[in-house]
A protein has these predicted regions:
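Conserved Nudix-box catalytic region and its N-terminal flanking loop in Nudix hydrolases
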Residues: 1-40
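A generic short-segment signal for beta-strand/edge and adjacent turn/coil regions
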Residues: 36-43, 56-61
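Short acidic/polar alpha-helix capping motifs at helix-coil junctions
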Residues: 2-3, 20, 42-44, 62, ...
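A short coil-to-beta-strand element that immediately follows conserved catalytic motifs
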Residues: 44-54
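Nudix hydrolase/Nudix homology domain
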Residues: 15-17, 53-55, 62-130
Length: 130
């Protein structure tokens, strides 16, 4: 999983490690269109990225109340992640993540999403066609 520090300008969990991309849907925008817009803004030269919807869940705390839609993207070439907007970002193994879970190192949302992401990635890797 590629993770990096959340910007200090974020409403939630400033500076904590999280999945690096998020956006709000525009009025009338579909989930797919929003995910594609986010990817094309983040990776303007990579037109072959296909987001795959995995889960939606309700997230609420003292600061926000939102519905989260989580997508994953398979990348053959991770060099596109070497971008200044992902400063400090890196690929994490499950073992590295699990070592830091529950220590307030990751964002609250990521802590909730992790087990689901781990299962989805494991299944996708198991049945990946080479």
């Amino acid at each position: 999983l590629f993770l990096c520090n959340r910007p200090q300008s974020c409403i939630l969990d400033k500076g904590k490690v999280d999945i690096p991309m998020e956006c709000y849907l525009r009025y009338g925008e579909t989930l797919t269109a929003g995910a594609n817009r986010l990817l094309s803004n983040a990776f303007p030269k990579a037109s072959d990225l296909k987001p795959t919807f995995t889960i939606s869940y309700h997230f609420e705390n003292e600061q926000t109340n939102r519905l989260v839609y989580l997508f994953i993207v398979d990348m053959e070439d991770d060099s596109i992640l070497c971008d200044p907007r992902f400063k400090g970002g890196k690929l994490w193994t499950f073992q590295q993540i699990e070592h830091n879970l529950g220590t307030h190192f990751f964002s609250e949302c990521f802590e909730l999403e992790y087990e689901h992401l781990k299962q989805v990635i494991g299944i996708r890797e198991k049945y990946k066609v080479s």
